[in-house]
Design a protein with these regions (language model features):
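Mature catalytic core of soluble alpha/beta enzymes
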Residues: 1-155
Length: 155
């Protein structure tokens, strides 16, 4: 919608979904650059608040995880992403981040893939043109779809 209204350069964050339209102006006023978006580290006790940053233009960055919306009962933490097979919180990952052109689709994909076994999720993401994913496993290691690293900002 915003593009149809003439917006050519915009970064929008709504409820944790981030959408980049076009590129941003560089500080010296000469040229443009891709937007830099940090991907939050789901491990709250870590000193490192972001896992990595991605460089995007014309894409959305959407994450689903077990670290923001949860509650604790008798010492057990329950998050909001429910496994449709067990009807309990999904136990596969700490976080899934999706890069794609449509923020609504990214939101649906991040939740759906959060509930899939890793290899099934990877195959599904790899079958979708223009879509990449990052998984944060329970032990904190990361796994990416085939083209995700093309967007990662070098440290």
């Amino acid at each position: 919608y915003l593009e149809s209204r003439g917006f050519q350069s915009l970064l929008l964050s709504v409820g944790g979904n981030i959408r980049a339209i076009g590129k941003k102006a560089v500080p010296d006023g000469e040229g443009e650059a891709r937007w830099t978006i940090g991907i939050q580290n789901p491990e709250k006790s870590s000193e490192r608040t972001e896992l990595m940053a991605v460089l995007i233009d014309g894409l959305s960055v959407v994450s689903s995880g077990n670290y923001e919306r949860y509650y604790t009962v008798n010492g057990t933490r329950y998050h909001h992403i429910i496994d449709p097979e067990t009807l309990f919180p999904s136990a596969c990952f700490n976080q899934v981040t999706i890069l794609c052109g449509d923020s609504g689709l990214g939101d649906a994909l991040s939740t759906a893939v959060f509930n899939m076994p890793l290899e099934e999720g990877r195959a599904y993401i790899d079958s979708l043109a223009g879509t990449e994913a990052l998984w944060v496993l329970k032990d904190g290691t990361t796994v990416c779809s085939a083209g995700f690293w093309d967007y990662v900002k070098p440290e």
